[in-house]
Amino acid sequence: MKRSVELKKGWSLKRAGKTAESQEDGLAAAETTAARLRDWIRIKTMPAQVQDVLYEHGLLPEEFRLGWCEKALFIGESDWIYRCSFTGEKGRKCRILFQGLDTIADIYLNGIKLGRCEDFYLPAEFDITDLLERDNTLYLHFISPISYMKEQDWEEKWNGSVMRCKTVRKPIHDFPPEKTEKGSNYQGAVPYFTPVGVYGPVSLVYYEEEEIRDDFIQARAEADGNGVLSIEMRGTGRPDTLTVHWDFSGENGKEKGDKGGSKSFRPDVREDGWSIREEIEVDSPPLWWPRGFGEQNLAEINIEIRKNGKVCDHILKRIGFRRIQMEVPFAYHINGKKVRLFGGSLDPLQGYTHCYQPDRERRLFEMVENANINTLRIWGEGIPLPDEFYDECDKRGILIWQEFFLGHGAYPDSEKIRDFCKKEAEYLVRRLRHHPSLLLWCGGNENPNGG
């Protein structure tokens, strides 16, 4: 059966390449620091960006966390290498999945280059079935984003309308401010933070021939009080059956096991894989409501595919039956009831790291509820948030205004940037579309004329 193994241990970090003059200035306060950065530094917890690791080992001053970054500029101007030693199951089908690389990284496994990541907003995945050994070594060579930006193609027509940092698919506030007289970037760092490194989980995904590769699960609440569970899926191999289980005995609401059910289907199998598209009628499902209007009833959906009676792959998601209507701009009715939005705009919780911080996020949700907020805007110039953030919004009834990661005016009209943005949008929609808390999609922040 398909399973995922996160690589949390066995990681270390070192600086690579030549050091620019400004970088050495940043290290001048301690001669031993420069020497230590040429050696491997053990990473205690993953994911962790370079700034997280150096601070934890006492290689960055305390003032860095307060926003004074002069002594940390060398991080964004340097190349960095992550190394991970891990044990694998040789002979099994396996992919390696990176769910957060910041940003330009060449990836090597056992001396073989797997490829390069150049987009902060996209996961990277490689099939390593033929390379995986019992004992393995993974290297991630992160290229300086400052140097990479300066090397990108630039067209004269962009002068005056496009910021140069937009040739890199990374948050624009991670780069030096173009108007240096301001003294800091938008998020308050002086002069700026440039996070680099691994900000999301790295996992081995062991899989079978029969596999789920894409899914679209939608719960609709009809006007008559009944519900429809819509399922579209596709995958590889030749599974015999696909079985859908659903119940409402989750964390929120009262026990409603009598509303659950199960149904099996035979997928449409072709030479290039399989697919299925079905609708299941659900009698009077408990409805999902935004905070302050009712319970956040969630249905747990477990879908399995089998071959010769063996479960080969499955997905587990929580969904909510609700109906959203917008009769005029921003006049929303949910499940037939008028809902007034009380919102806040969510900025990244930290400037110096893009790693998700569950404790800080829980505190944020407490503040949101204390402020009587029922809607959060995910800022287009911010960073992607993991599934657990949206799961928490589902549980708490917090509606989401989701922006695509674009903002602050025009972008280069190059084929490379267009292709990245298209892939980002497709990935984000596929990942989030089943969440009942998702209220609307927005094209970005402050870029109607040039986005």
Give the location of each predicted region.
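Secreted/periplasmic carbohydrate-active enzymes, especially glycoside hydrolases
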Residues: 1-376, 395
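Substrate-binding cleft of carbohydrate-active enzyme catalytic domains
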Residues: 323-451
